[in-house]
Amino acid sequence: MDKKFIRNFSIIAHIDHGKSTLSDRIIEFTNTLSKREMTNQILDSMDIERERGITIKLNAVQIKYHARDNNEYLIHLIDTPGHVDFTYEVSRSLAACEGAILVVDAAQGIEAQTLSNVYLALENNLEIVPTINKIDLPSADPERVKKEIEDVIGLDTSDIPLISAKTGLNIQDVLEAIIKHVPPPLDANDDAKLQALIFDSFYDSYKGVVCLVRIKQGTIKVGDKIRMMANNKDYIVSELGIRTPKIVNKTELVAGEVGWVAAAIKTVKDINVGDTITHANNPADKPLPGYKKILPMVYCGLYPIDTSQYDDLKEAMAKISLSDAALTYEYETSQALGFGIRCGFLGLLHMDVIRERIAREFNIELILTAPSVIYKIELTNNQEISIDSPAKMPEPTNIKAIKEPFVKLAIITPDNYVGAIMELCQSRRGSYQDLEVIDGTRRRLIYKMPLAEIMYSFFDSLKSITKGYATMDYELIGYQAEKLVKIDIMLNGNKVDALSIIAHRDFAYGKSKIICERLKEVIPKHQFEIPIQASIGSKIIARETIKAVRKDVIAKCYGGDVSRKKKLLEQQKEGKKRLKAIGNVDVPQDAFVKVLSEN
């Protein structure tokens, strides 16, 4: 096929602006799938994606479209996630394209992640085609949104498609805009040395790891000996093809095409997303510009509530990590919770999705320890180490400084909530950077804030004070030294490692008090008094006491000498003292679940 009839594009948007629904309508309009084969969110392959109405894994399909100019075009569509946690998925798909459709909600207008995705597209030199969706809503105001797109992003909206992905209104206008504005891959040459960009991978129990690729140059065929340029590993191509979104086998993929390649690769860890595939016997001179290695932002310990399921949890993590390149994990033990796994996630939604997949696909209920970020510790001997858990914190005497990650936080909000949001950000150690006007009623607030503060229910608080109208987006900007301390929680004088946290010194007392109070509520009474203490080093900063259960030892004394009663009470007192010295505090699992889930 002549390269001028090929188009490669992504759909980008803020979460819930209708990307996946638009993908459905395009697939339906072009008869890529029959009516019987169509389901809602056809490109969202996981049940969790369909139930939550979000896209987590990106997906790619090949579509044939007979345009108004009477030519048939080969269009490769890549659907992308919209949530901030999965920005890395968006950046991967954009590198495989020449253009992007920017979907904007006709009622909501431009939101936080609309802008961050636009910047990603511009970084990849993509042609952006704006599209206004949901024009069938009673609250839709396409003219206002057009003005926003022109003023805030600077895109021309004179011939912008106005569509309803839900009803299928004006879907052909989107396809025509793609043909008109997205450039074809004219520099692609079938006879050049092979350069194929891996923009995603997934695990298939029969094929092994399947790579989703964009063939930039050259041709790849079944039986070819290929090489991964990042690690110089060689494989033989066993199968390849395209997705429609059904898996369709082919004998070759040529320059300009988007498809999949299987080569008996054992695990996803053998594949670097962003790597370049070339021929082993005639390799390309240099790899394509790849991606940055994905680094987890949030760490958390996962422990099975039923400790006998630890081996099942190990197996579950191994299987899930086969198809999730961003998930990292290592085994750990806790004196309080037993054997578990410490995992690195892209963000809290990613963490929640993994927890739900383990519960649903493997029937394992989990306790999650308090999420933590990566701290950089400067030691007194001038070494620098990174820790992802309070348990790994060195002794205070060995620490020169503790640095924590900071983010640039952008919040788009109706102007009547600006004051409340500024108060929230300041209470979370945020420092004000900028305030931009988007239109007559909406503002964009920029704050610099510690990542750790965003993790603890910040998004819930933001939604609560703005009645759900504010949207946010953040990006990591670096590390900064802060007055941070490790808070240990002790029960009856013994440290409980699972409850340790790292906090700012100014907020340490408040957080400690809350944890101690919650523990007092959930730990049952024992026959001896239990002190619950929070400490920084050897200094106790908060305390609660669980009173002892009193057994009435003098109930059997009817009258008689008072010294008899005193003797029995004295014996009880001695017994309790002995019990307190040697007795272990029995903390039920649900107490940990309650304290950690609310922490």
Swiss-Prot record:
Superkingdom assignment: Bacteria
Q: Give residues annotated as binding GTP.
A: D16, H17, G18, K19, S20, T21, N133, K134, I135, D136
User: Could you tell me which InterPro entries the record lists for this protein?
Assistant: EF-4, EFG_III/V, EFG_V-like, EFTu-like_2, G_TR_CS, LepA_C_sf, LepA_CTD, LepA_IV
Which keywords annotate this record? Cell membrane, GTP-binding, Hydrolase, Membrane, Nucleotide-binding, Protein biosynthesis
Bilayer disposition of the protein: Peripheral membrane protein
Compartments where found: Cell membrane
Q: Which reaction does it catalyse?
A: GTP + H2O = GDP + phosphate + H(+)
| A GO molecular function held by the record | ribosome binding
What GO cellular component entries does it have? Answer: plasma membrane
Q: Which GO terms describe its biological process?
A: positive regulation of translation
Q: What is its main location?
A: membrane
Q: Name one Pfam family in it.
A: GTP_EFTU_D2
Q: What is its EC number?
A: 3.6.5.n1
| SMART domains, per the entry | EFG_C (SM00838)
Q: Give start and end of each tr-type G domain.
A: 4-186
**Family that this chain belongs to:** Belongs to the TRAFAC class translation factor GTPase superfamily. Classic translation factor GTPase family. LepA subfamily.
Record-linked PANTHER family:
TRANSLATION FACTOR GUF1 HOMOLOG, CHLOROPLASTIC, TRANSLATION FACTOR GUF1-RELATED
Say what the protein does: Required for accurate and efficient protein synthesis under certain stress conditions. May act as a fidelity factor of the translation reaction, by catalyzing a one-codon backward translocation of tRNAs on improperly translocated ribosomes. Back-translocation proceeds from a post-translocation (POST) complex to a pre-translocation (PRE) complex, thus giving elongation factor G a second chance to translocate the tRNAs correctly. Binds to ribosomes in a GTP-dependent manner.
NCBIfam families given in the database record: lepA, small_GTP
Specify the protein name: Elongation factor 4
Species per Swiss-Prot/TrEMBL record? Ureaplasma urealyticum serovar 10 (strain ATCC 33699 / Western)
